Amino acid sequence: MAIERTFSIIKPDAVAKNHIGAIYNRFETAGLKIIASKMIHLSKEQAEGFYAEHSERPFFGALVAFMTSGPIMVQTLEGENAVLAHREILGATNPAEAAEGTIRADFAESIDENAAHGSDSVASAEREVAYFFSAEELCPRTR
């Protein structure tokens, strides 16, 4: 099995509802280690930069507005097949389609306010981690 890193965001809706601890518990219970974490309030420029690949999509403005509406938690997770493991814990993007017991089924209200983000590939994870964390901020856990 491959040890990977992935990037995760707990979005403003879930932060506002105090779900941070419950979501972190899901990560750790699944064997993912949190090796970097911080709470930030994205600026419009930061949100537009992070979601630049969606800039031509009709939902881009609403996405940026939502992601800047309150603080978020950003974290880097490490573990076996971390990208896939994290996406399985999150569940389907639309919480109405998410499997029971997943983060989005349990904590999200709608497809627009769906509680969390997870990298969709190792390449995306590397780019997304680097967007928010310097190498010095990553703390691999060896114990």
UniProtKB/Swiss-Prot annotation:
Subcellular location: Cytoplasm
Signal peptide range in chain numbering: none
Family matches, as Pfam families: NDK
MF-aspect GO terms: ATP binding; metal ion binding; nucleoside diphosphate kinase activity
Source organism (scientific name): Shewanella pealeana (strain ATCC 700345 / ANG-SQ1)
Family: Belongs to the NDK family.
Binding site for ATP: 11, 59, 87, 93, 104, 114
Enzyme class: transferase
The keyword ATP-binding appears for this protein: yes
SUPFAM superfamilies given in the database record: Nucleoside diphosphate kinase, NDK
Active-site residues from the entry: 117 (pros-phosphohistidine intermediate)
Co-factor(s): Mg(2+)
Reaction(s) the record says it catalyses: a 2'-deoxyribonucleoside 5'-diphosphate + ATP = a 2'-deoxyribonucleoside 5'-triphosphate + ADP; a ribonucleoside 5'-diphosphate + ATP = a ribonucleoside 5'-triphosphate + ADP
EC number: 2.7.4.6
InterPro entries: NDK-like_dom, NDK-like_dom_sf, Nucleoside_diP_kinase, Nucleoside_diP_kinase_AS
Keyword Calcium: no
Protein's UniProt name: Nucleoside diphosphate kinase
Subunit annotation: Homotetramer.
Name of the gene this protein is made from: ndk
Any one of the GO BP annotations: CTP biosynthetic process
Function: Major role in the synthesis of nucleoside triphosphates other than ATP. The ATP gamma phosphate is transferred to the NDP beta phosphate via a ping-pong mechanism, using a phosphorylated active-site intermediate.
Matches recorded under CDD domains: NDPk_I (cd04413)
Keywords, alphabetical: ATP-binding, Cytoplasm, Kinase, Magnesium, Metal-binding, Nucleotide metabolism, Nucleotide-binding, Phosphoprotein, Transferase
